Amino acid sequence: MKLSWRSMRHLLVAVALAAAACSSATGPQPAARTGALPRLVFFMNPNGLPCQMQDRILREVSSELSGRAELVYYRTTEPADIPQFGRYGVRSLPLLLVTDASGAELRRATPGIQSPDQVRRLLGP
């Protein structure tokens, strides 16, 4: 059976995500802090145009995040970040979600590009 390059790439991504989901490592653990800020977590492929567009939007609203949330990036190109994709069940990019300081998921946006207003609403009041 001969696979096209596109099919092979999809297969490799699926295998990597499955391996990450089966891994006992959960990635870096946040330090225990009282009163720590929630995290706005951005799962991205730095080479993908939709993810690049979402990154620009996040940079636009970054000044509004100060004191409200910590912005955390997980990239498909960083091997150390891959387990986080499995941990949160990420299957589509770009994806934004909000976690508490310990990493527990609070809210998740629909995968795709979120406008500045959608990012603000995701963070809540």
Task: Identify what each model region corresponds to.
Residues K2-L12:
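Bacterial N-terminal signal peptides that target proteins for export
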Residues A18-A21:
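C-terminal motif of bacterial Sec signal peptides marking the signal peptidase cleavage site
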Residues S23-T26:
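Bacterial signal peptide processing site
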Residues T34-N47:
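Short active-site neighborhood of thiol/selenol oxidoreductases, capturing the structured segment around
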Residues F43, G67-D81:
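Thiol-based oxidoreductase modules, predominantly thioredoxin-like and allied folds used
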Residues Q52-E64:
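Typically the conserved alpha-helix immediately C-terminal to a functionally engaged Cys/Sec
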Residues Y88-V98:
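Structural micro-motif
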Residues V98-P125:
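Non-catalytic, surface beta->alpha helical segment in thiol-disulfide oxidoreductase systems
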